Amino acid sequence: MSHGGGGHAAELFPEDQVLAFGAVLSLVGIYIAHFFPSLAMLLGGLLAAGACVAGANTTRRVAAYGLGTGVPSIGMVSLGMGTISALAGVLIPSAFGLPVLVTPILAAVIAVVVGFIVGKLTQNPVGMKVPIIVSSMTKLSLMGALAILGFCTAFAGGFSADIIINGAINNGVIALAFIAAGMAILHPFNACIGPDESHKRTMTLAVACGFMAWLVFAIAKLDIVSTAVAAIFWFIAYGTFVKTSLADACEVKYVPELPKKE
């Protein structure tokens, strides 16, 4: 049921489990990309998609309270908080002499703090009356940070400050991460929203969007193997989404080719 006209069906997968699954996968992927640069895009990019899926699931839950056009906006907010947190996690260790291996964990901790603060601000002074807005902003900030750091690390081949600055910031790749991961987090529920929305169908599209973000990065890096694997994974996931949509629809009408003349 929708909490506020948002079009939210019953949950098949508990949010906290999806969140934990996405966080663990993305963190593992970040460390794999750092320690094994040759596998950075293949495995790091794949596992970074887990953060996108978990973020899309949280977007679905909070947007069910009737955010309306706020569905895309909250996805962008997620990546805004995530970008700040990821950059802080990358730069603080080099500035204060901390071990570089704490970077992903530090970014995650900062993201949780930033998300909590932003969530509180949306209650007061903004005045949003969504009961789960604070916890949702916290989770979205975390997933945004892990997605940004995950894809940037996969592209650059590591998460130390010098590698990220030269391999993901100076060349503008972090902007690509912002858009690709942001779309993967906001689009699934925005596309499936409505009275006939189902958790399974929305999450299937979320997986497809996560794979598409990975595919975009694989193409940008000119990684042939990762591009081929990501394309196959995306094709399977999106094909499953289309089949699920056709099965759930009460009626399917195929639009003929537009007439060439009146």
Swiss-Prot record:
GO cellular component annotations of the record: plasma membrane
Any single GO BP term: methanogenesis, from carbon dioxide
Topology of this chain in the membrane: Multi-pass membrane protein
One of the record's GO molecular function terms: tetrahydromethanopterin S-methyltransferase activity
Superkingdom per UniProt: Archaea
Assembly and oligomerization: The complex is composed of 8 subunits; MtrA, MtrB, MtrC, MtrD, MtrE, MtrF, MtrG and MtrH.
Protein name: Tetrahydromethanopterin S-methyltransferase subunit C
Naturally occurring in which organism (per UniProt): Methanococcus maripaludis (strain C5 / ATCC BAA-1333)
